[in-house]
């Protein structure tokens, strides 16, 4: 008996079945780096239209977490997909290197500046520490498969970048947006510094909730407003507050001009309250009986004066729209030094902006005997007792409410009026211009627009000064007496920037003012403040994008960060760009959600539900992490767990196995010599290429709209449905048994080749390592890397006007599905083993029969049976099985003949060929003759 196995075209490839990614990926990375893959891509894309995704800099502190992985991989997917779309898309990663977290780490190592080390030594250690953190994070980002200019990233502590940050401040000053003022700012006593909006988080806190009486200074004048001549006891305007510690700074009581206020008599005292709140105040104060003596509008009480409850001065009643009826008494205790609304209304009435609290959060000497030197939050109970002793406390209770806290220390913060530098939102129309610019940006998801519009519309002036050591200096000179900026500020800023560009920020602190001011040095002093780190990162469109040569002077096309950055980097970048350029720094802003565990819980070390990207890469490989991110709808919360990653690994195996099948069956195929022209190909092969074409159209549209989970879904559908459950199954017979160089086989290989060329490109942005590996096994001459290529343009499909068009094959697929059900039932009943043991008779109506008959003798190949007959529907015997397809019944029987040892089909002509007596006639033709002809399947 002959060994016919050697006559088969069995699949063969060196492409491994197992990905073994954790082991294989580092070797690939080494090759990418040694061959300068990023540089190769840049050279290949030179001269193309640019797409610039500007990297929002992560903070240079600590190891990367799973959220970092999401962010960087999403960016990498976009950059790579844009490259495949024909763009030159350089990616320059960056890091945020100044600021408090690094200072705190360095303090733990060497102590505070000015104690064990000088400020200069402290800054040098901060720079060294930040560089170490950058190196660690960089290694992890590279391990993720993210391609970028890792040898030349931007760091906000680069001397040139520090200088350009200073220059950005100079342009803001030139355009009239900077001012100085003693405004209340978020202040952290633990930090000893002002905080930016983005550095504030909210947590629940329990505070005293108190109603406090302010007695009228001129009782008769107050009573006259209510049309009352006398009352029993003192007349008091009642305020409600949850911050008793701010009462020493009280300088007014705010009322709403439009509200109705009532004079209410209780036992031994007359109270002034908003009419709509009288009942709720009485209820919480435990007062069951009261009498309304009179009423008036809030406007009637303007500028009447009331005695401070424990300090020896009186304060005016003033009017403000910020007073509401949501809670309280309708009268708001007003301390301009401790609240933005209070500050605005105090400015309007030209009131003192009192700030009796020092930078450490303790009262200054001279505030009040029992309070001097006390920490404000510890003083709350003291103040309640003082009010009780003075008879000014109407009611006290504990209230749990959301309270602003320091993002770093998690401790409650205060509003505190300090001399600070601000970017004004309104003095030169920055708010109005920013709101206008927002409308010209594409926000993805689109709810991002309303979110940032609300933030810009309601935000206060931006306090950009900080009292820190490790930061970019404001580099300003102010007059010793007037505190006005030097008239040559623009020129001086450039002079300082040049020194910083040469020697770093220490150059500012080492600078002798006389070196740049000359004789003016006697009258001007250096501003000691540093810039808010959000100014550092928010100015990178100017300090980095505008100056890096690879960006060619183009503005950024996209900013992509987590959804918390609407009030962070997106906001600060918008403010600075609009202030210095009059336009937004980006065309598109894309946000992603935060990672949660499989149960939807926030990641927390204390819960123990964190997922380490390093662990995932070491165990499963970066491509599994990348596929998980690519397959997730990142617009909301992004769930990750061992089980979810396992599902990603399963999906990966399906895709890898498909790719391996394609490669194995391209063995011996040279696309230059062996390709079959589309018009000469077997119809089914053209259909398969058409499936790839249809899939590519959807995949490219999904990449274009950044819906990467749709890319993965369509890729999986293509591999599992069109290919895995139909086409790849059907072609095995023709691929393995036809003559190796026959049109029948080469047609199939031509289809597999086109499909492979497309598939590897679809995968490349998401499963980059695997795509590169597949690329290296594909036949034919090609570029060194798939990442330098564009989407495959060699796909074609069936014309809708053809008889065997896509709709025709869709019907064949439905018939095959019904046949499979009948075969499966027969196997379960032990009537047959495999499908090739079956012969099926399809009883079809005229319409369906007409389609099935077009496949002629090749129909059984499409059904994976040894025989297939088509009969009239009405001739179906009772034993024929009904199907879910209207007009189709199926009868199954055992195939006649014997099993051919070569093709495994059951045939009645085995032995008919004398030269090859062991095999069927078809195989004999394929082995020793001209080979079978296939037209359809």
Curated annotation (Swiss-Prot):
One of the GO BP terms on file: isoleucyl-tRNA aminoacylation
Residue positions binding ATP: 605
HAMAP family, per the entry: Ile_tRNA_synth_type1
Function: Catalyzes the attachment of isoleucine to tRNA(Ile). As IleRS can inadvertently accommodate and process structurally similar amino acids such as valine, to avoid such errors it has two additional distinct tRNA(Ile)-dependent editing activities. One activity is designated as 'pretransfer' editing and involves the hydrolysis of activated Val-AMP. The other activity is designated 'posttransfer' editing and involves deacylation of mischarged Val-tRNA(Ile).
Free-text comment on this protein's domains from its UniProt entry: IleRS has two distinct active sites: one for aminoacylation and one for editing. The misactivated valine is translocated from the active site to the editing site, which sterically excludes the correctly activated isoleucine. The single editing site contains two valyl binding pockets, one specific for each substrate (Val-AMP or Val-tRNA(Ile)).
NCBIfam families for the chain: ileS (TIGR00392)
Protein name in the entry: Isoleucine--tRNA ligase
Pfam family, one: Anticodon_1
An example Gene Ontology molecular-function term: zinc ion binding
Motif ('KMSKS' region) on chain: 602-606
EC identifiers of the protein: 6.1.1.5
Quaternary state and interactors: Monomer.
Primary subcellular site in the record, as a coarse category: cytoplasm
Entry's family note: Belongs to the class-I aminoacyl-tRNA synthetase family. IleS type 1 subfamily.
Keyword Transmembrane helix in record: no
């Amino acid at each position: 008996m002959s060994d016919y196995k050697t006559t088969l075209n069995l699949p063969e490839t060196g492409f491994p079945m197992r990905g073994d990614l954790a082991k294989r990926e580092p070797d690939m990375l080494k090759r990418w780096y040694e061959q300068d893959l990023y540089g190769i891509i840049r050279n290949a894309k030179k001269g193309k239209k640019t797409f610039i995704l500007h990297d929002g800099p992560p903070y240079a502190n600590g190891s990367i977490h799973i959220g970092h992985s999401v962010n960087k991989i999403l960016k990498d997917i976009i950059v790579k997909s844009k490259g495949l779309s024909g763009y030159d898309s350089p990616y320059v990663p960056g890091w945020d290197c100044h600021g408090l977290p690094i200072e705190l780490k360095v303090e733990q190592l060497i102590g505070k500046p000015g104690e064990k080390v000088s400020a200069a030594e402290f800054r040098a250690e901060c720079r060294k520490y930040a560089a170490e953190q950058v190196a660690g994070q960089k290694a992890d980002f590279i391990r993720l498969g993210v391609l970028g200019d890792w040898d030349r990233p931007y760091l906000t502590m680069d001397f040139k970048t520090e200088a350009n940050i200073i220059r950005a401040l100079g342009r803001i000053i030139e355009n009239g947006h900077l001012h100085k003022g003693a405004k209340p700012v978020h202040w952290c006593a633990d930090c000893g510094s002002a905080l930016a909006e983005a550095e504030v988080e909210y947590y629940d806190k329990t505070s005293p909730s108190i109603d406090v009486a302010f007695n009228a200074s001129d009782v008769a004048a107050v009573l006259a407003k209510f049309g009352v001549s006398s009352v029993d006891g003192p007349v008091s305007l009642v305020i409600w507050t949850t911050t008793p510690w701010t009462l020493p700074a009280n300088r007014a009581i705010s009322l709403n001009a439009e509200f109705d206020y009532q004079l209410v008599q209780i036992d031994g005292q007359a109270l002034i309250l908003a009419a709509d709140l009288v009942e709720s105040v009485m209820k919480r104060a435990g007062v069951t009986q009261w009498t309304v003596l009179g009423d008036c509008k809030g406007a009637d009480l303007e500028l009447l004066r009331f005695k401070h409850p424990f300090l020896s001065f009186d304060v005016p009643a003033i009017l403000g729209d910020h007073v509401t009826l949501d809670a309280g008494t309708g009268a708001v205790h007003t301390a301009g030094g401790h609240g933005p609304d209070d500050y605005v209304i105090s400015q309007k009435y030209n009131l003192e902006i009192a700030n009796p609290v020092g930078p450490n959060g303790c009262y200054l000497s001279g505030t009040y005997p029992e309070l001097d030197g006390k920490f404000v939050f510890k003083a709350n109970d003291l103040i309640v007792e003082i009010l009780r002793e003075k008879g000014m406390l109407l009611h006290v209770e504990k209230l749990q409410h959301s309270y602003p806290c320091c993002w770093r220390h998690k401790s409650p913060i205060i509003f505190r009026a300090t001399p600070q530098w601000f970017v004004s939102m309104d003095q030169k129309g920055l708010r109005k211009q920013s709101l206008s610019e927002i409308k010209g940006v594409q926000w993805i998801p689109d709810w991002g627009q309303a979110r940032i519009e609300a933030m810009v519309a309601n935000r206060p002036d931006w306090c950009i000064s900080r009292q820190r050591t490790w930061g970019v200096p404001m580099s300003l000179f102010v007059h010793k007496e007037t505190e006005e900026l030097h008239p040559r500020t623009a020129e001086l800023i450039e002079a300082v920037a040049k020194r910083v560009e040469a020697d770093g920020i220490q150059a500012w602190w080492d600078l002798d003012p006389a070196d740049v001011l000359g004789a003016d040095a006697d009258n001007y002093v250096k501003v000691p403040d540093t810039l808010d780190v959000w100014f550092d990162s928010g100015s990178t469109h100017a300090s980095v994008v505008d100056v890096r040569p690879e960006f060619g002077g183009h503005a950024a096309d996209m900013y992509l960060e987590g959804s918390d950055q609407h009030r962070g980097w997106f906001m600060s970048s918008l403010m600075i760009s609009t202030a210095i350029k009059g336009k937004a720094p980006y065309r598109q802003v894309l946000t992603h959600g935060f990672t949660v565990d499989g149960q939807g819980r926030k990641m927390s070390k204390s819960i123990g539900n964190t997922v380490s990207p390093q662990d995932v890469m070491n165990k499963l490989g970066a491509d599994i992490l990348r596929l998980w991110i690519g397959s997730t709808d990142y617009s909301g919360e992004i769930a990750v767990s061992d089980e979810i990653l396992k599902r990603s690994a399963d999906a990966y195996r399906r895709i890898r196995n498909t790719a391996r099948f394609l490669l194995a069956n391209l063995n011996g195929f040279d696309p230059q010599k062996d390709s079959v022209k589309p018009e000469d190909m077997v119809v089914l092969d053209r259909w398969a290429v058409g499936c790839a074409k249809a899939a590519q159209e959807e995949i490219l549209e999904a990449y274009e709209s950044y819906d990467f989970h749709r890319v993965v879904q369509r890729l999986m559908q293509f591999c599992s449905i069109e290919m895995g459950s139909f086409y790849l199954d059907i072609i095995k017979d023709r691929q393995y048994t036809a003559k190796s160089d026959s049109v029948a086989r080469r047609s199939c290989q031509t289809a597999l080749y086109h499909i492979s060329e497309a598939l590897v490109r679809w995968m490349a942005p998401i499963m980059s390592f695997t795509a590169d590996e597949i690329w290296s096994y594909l036949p034919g001459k090609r570029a060194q890397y798939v990442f330098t290529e564009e989407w495959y343009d060699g796909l074609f499909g069936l014309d809708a006007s053809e008889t065997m068009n896509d709709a025709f094959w869709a019907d064949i697929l439905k018939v095959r599905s019904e046949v499979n059900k009948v075969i499966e039932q027969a196997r379960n009943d032990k009537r047959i083993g495999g499908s090739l043991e079956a012969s099926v008779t399809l009883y079809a109506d005229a319409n369906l029969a007409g389609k099935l008959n077009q496949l002629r003798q090749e129909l059984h190949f499409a059904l994976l049976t040894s025989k297939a007959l088509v009969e009239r529907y009405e001739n179906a015997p009772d034993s024929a099985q009904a199907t879910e397809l209207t007009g189709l019944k199926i009868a199954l029987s055992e195939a006649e003949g014997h099993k051919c040892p070569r093709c495994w089909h059951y045939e009645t002509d085995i032995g008919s060929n004398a030269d090859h007596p062991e095999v069927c006639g078809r195989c004999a033709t394929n082995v020793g003759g001209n080979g079978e002809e296939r037209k359809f399947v």
